[in-house]
């Protein structure tokens, strides 16, 4: 049985039986972490450490999705994070006892040329929750086995279409290939609880008519089926005529995002690139989490005195 949950910009359907079993299997520490993540007063007192670290392994993507700027990365700008930087990050994560690691923040993570070595290092992260998000195109058998062996708790595959024609139109990829990869992953996982499987569709004019077909296709296979609202960042240089703001953005209060080049950001949206906090090559996560830059940003959010970049983000505008 699938339950519907309205999460604002995300409309979610989830397998009640599977998610209940998964949550129970993850234990009481995990449940306490999730309660803290969803706490309505999370902005009142700054946590001593981020709840989650998001990590980008590459600067680029092998797909050409029409709604994503990663489709247009020049060859000279295609960069992959060094394995040693990942190792340094894992050391930081373990020292701070961060609860959650999310890999694949802004680009396609599984095309990293040393993805096997990266997963071996990430396996050493002592976290309660470990998520990988991918387009699924590079989810071959070897990588799928590595993901399962690394202790990943959640695998999230961005699909955006129910038919191969729409999939190619939106993503310029091969849906049959990706679905075969997912089916093999499910078979390799077998009766194990983890990783759970989430599939998602970013709703836009091109695919909205396939919502029901997408839902029916993935019921019985995916544990979570999400429909997301497309966030438009094209107007970032033009201040919106907005007079009311609500401090709904809790990103800098609960997570940090790390780019392929080691630069650390206070949020996982494209707007976050305007607020670099430092670099994991020479600064610890603890220093950046407690630093002046992020403290100033948090205060702006709490007092609704938003800077011109955040002022255009849907998380804080009405």
Regions found by a protein language model. Give the residues of each.
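C-terminal accessory region of radical SAM enzymes
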Residues: 2-13, 181, 187-196, 218-247, ...
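Secreted/processed peptides and extracellular or luminal domains of membrane proteins
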Residues: 67, 71-74, 224, 255, ...
């Amino acid at each position: 049985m699938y339950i519907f949950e309205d999460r604002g910009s995300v409309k979610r359907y989830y397998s009640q039986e599977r998610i209940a079993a998964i949550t129970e299997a993850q234990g009481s520490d995990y449940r306490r972490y999730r309660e803290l993540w969803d706490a309505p007063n999370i902005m009142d007192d700054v946590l001593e450490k981020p709840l989650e670290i998001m990590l980008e392994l590459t600067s680029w993507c092998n797909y050409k999705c029409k709604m994503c700027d990663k489709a247009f990365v020049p060859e000279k700008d295609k960069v992959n994070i060094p394995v040693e930087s990942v190792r340094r990050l894992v050391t930081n994560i373990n020292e701070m006892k961060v609860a959650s690691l999310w890999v694949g923040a802004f680009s396609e993570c599984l095309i990293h040329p040393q993805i096997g070595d990266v997963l071996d290092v990430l396996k050493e992260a002592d976290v309660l929750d470990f998520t990988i998000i991918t387009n699924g195109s590079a989810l071959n058998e070897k990588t799928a086995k590595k993901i399962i062996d690394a202790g990943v708790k959640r695998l999230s595959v961005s699909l955006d279409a129910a038919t191969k024609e729409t999939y190619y139109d939106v993503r310029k990829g091969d849906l049959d290939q990706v679905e075969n990869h997912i089916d093999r992953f499910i078979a390799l996982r077998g009766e194990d609880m983890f990783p759970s499987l989430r599939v998602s569709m970013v709703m836009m004019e091109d695919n909205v008519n396939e919502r029901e077909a997408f839902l029916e296709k993935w019921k019985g296979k995916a544990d979570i089926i999400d429909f997301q609202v497309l966030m438009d960042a094209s107007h970032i240089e033009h201040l919106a005529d907005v007079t009311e703001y609500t401090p709904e953005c809790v990103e800098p209060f609960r997570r940090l995002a790390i780019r392929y080049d080691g630069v650390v950001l206070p949020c996982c949206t494209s707007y976050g690139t305007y607020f670099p906090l430092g670099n994991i090559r020479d600064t610890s996560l603890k220093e950046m989490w407690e630093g002046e830059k992020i403290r100033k940003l948090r205060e702006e959010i709490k007092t609704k005195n938003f800077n011109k970049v955040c002022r255009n983000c849907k998380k804080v505008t009405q």
